[in-house]
Amino acid sequence: VNQLFSEGATIIMSNLQERLPKLAMFCRELEKVFSARVQTNIYMTPANSQGFKAHYDGHDVLVLQVEGTKEWRIYDTPVHLPLEEQAFNPHDVPIGELTDSFVLEPGDMVYVPRGLTHDAVSTDQTSLHITTGLMMRSWADVMVEAVRKMALSDAEFREGLPPGFANEGFDTSGA
């Protein structure tokens, strides 16, 4: 790990709320406020390094800079409000134009909404930040859950679709 870090790799400590009681309490309180699942990761990036290339997340993020400084860059957003299943793929989604950049210093916090393309590069010192992921439920999540509940209680919703239903020109009047 030390060798990779000295070569510029970022150390990621995932789901630390499962190991640190204070972070667990912090996450539980945020879950009450936002009615969302909340988790934390800690990122330690060596000086003048980048942990991830430009990307967007499928959930909202709060970033708290703890040590060092990090330059954040924001790009045009290619996917508006992506679902978790619409994970960023650099081959499918081109990176937009740079629209903003700023430096986070210890104690600074930034909100990064889901779908906002961004990257971050540490400056001339090691950077440590806590990322809090807010996995908010969408109307799509609620609708999928409602249809599933209907299917569990009503066999009609579990019937197979008629043969040829996906074909162009299929007559839906008899379906």
Locate each region found by the language model:
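Active-site region of the double-stranded beta-helix
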Residues: V1-D108, L116-E156
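Helix-loop elements that line ligand-binding/catalytic pockets
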Residues: K149-A175
